Amino acid sequence: MAAQGEPQVQFKLVLVGDGGTGKTTFVKRHLTGEFEKKYVATLGVEVHPLVFHTNRGPIKFNVWDTAGQEKFGGLRDGYYIQAQCAIIMFDVTSRVTYKNVPNWHRDLVRVCENIPIVLCGNKVDIKDRKVKAKSIVFHRKKNLQYYDISAKSNYNFEKPFLWLARKLIGDPNFEFVAMPALAPPEVVMDPALAAQYEQDLQHAQATALPDEDDDL
């Protein structure tokens, strides 16, 4: 039984990607999750309970954050076991972090098989973007969802969670009725830049995939 006021619906979400892509910054934006996080010493993981209020009551994503161990090689299977969904993050200002996305995806599906996954390109607030919409094709090949995000400005913060919730619950009309309390923006996402990026993504989505069958 869930405690009084505790969301009945809970999901384990694993957050993966290269070190320095902004995973911890992203998960810390959700203030109650940051306040209530727990450290799992055996795995060296912080679990942030992120609650969202929806048209079907509150739901909770228990977000597993690696606390930087990915810098020392792969993650242990214990991190992935029983994950119900995942976010793979890369940094749009660093091409190598996008090049490594297939490795993270491979590790995930090896343990978790067929779970819903969102790919997020973080740091889109930075003007010097290296990984452009047209070169982000991995999600289309593997049937993942993709979002541009900017953790420091809260831009698109809720989008990955809403998409995952709709998939997990099986209801396309599922909505968040209120935004969670987020840390104040540290940078401002330029609305014109955001609009341009959204247009670029739509255009890229409508473009045929390149023929070569490598994983990038």
From Swiss-Prot:
Record family assignment: Belongs to the small GTPase superfamily. Ran family.
Cofactor binding notes: Mg(2+) interacts primarily with the phosphate groups of the bound guanine nucleotide.
Identification of the protein by name: GTP-binding nuclear protein Ran
Signal peptide range in chain numbering: none
Function according to Swiss-Prot or TrEMBL: GTPase involved in nucleocytoplasmic transport, participating both to the import and the export from the nucleus of proteins and RNAs. Switches between a cytoplasmic GDP- and a nuclear GTP-bound state by nucleotide exchange and GTP hydrolysis. Nuclear import receptors such as importin beta bind their substrates only in the absence of GTP-bound RAN and release them upon direct interaction with GTP-bound RAN, while export receptors behave in the opposite way.
Gene Ontology cellular component list: cytosol; nuclear envelope; nucleus
Oligomer and partners: Monomer. Interacts with rangap1, which promotes ran-mediated GTP hydrolysis. Interacts with kpnb1. Interaction with kpnb1 inhibits rangap1-mediated stimulation of GTPase activity. Interacts with rcc1 which promotes the exchange of ran-bound GDP by GTP. Interaction with kpnb1 inhibits rcc1-mediated exchange of ran-bound GDP by GTP. Interacts (GTP-bound form) with tnpo1; the interaction is direct. Interacts (GTP-bound form) with tnpo3; the interaction is direct. Interacts with kpnb1 and with tnpo1; both inhibit ran GTPase activity.
Location relative to the cell: Nucleus; Nucleus envelope; Cytoplasm, Cytosol; Cytoplasm
EC number: 3.6.5.-
Keyword Iron-sulfur tagged: no
Organism: Xenopus tropicalis
Gene from which the chain derives: ran
Stored InterPro entries: P-loop_NTPase, Ran_GTPase, Small_GTP-bd, Small_GTPase
Chain residue ranges for the region called Switch-II: 68-84
Keyword terms: Cytoplasm, Developmental protein, GTP-binding, Hydrolase, Magnesium, Metal-binding, Nucleotide-binding, Nucleus, Protein transport, Transport
Stretches the record annotates as Switch-I: 37-45
UniProt catalytic activity: GTP + H2O = GDP + phosphate + H(+)
Domain Small GTPase Ran-type: 7-171
Pfam families assigned: Ras (PF00071)
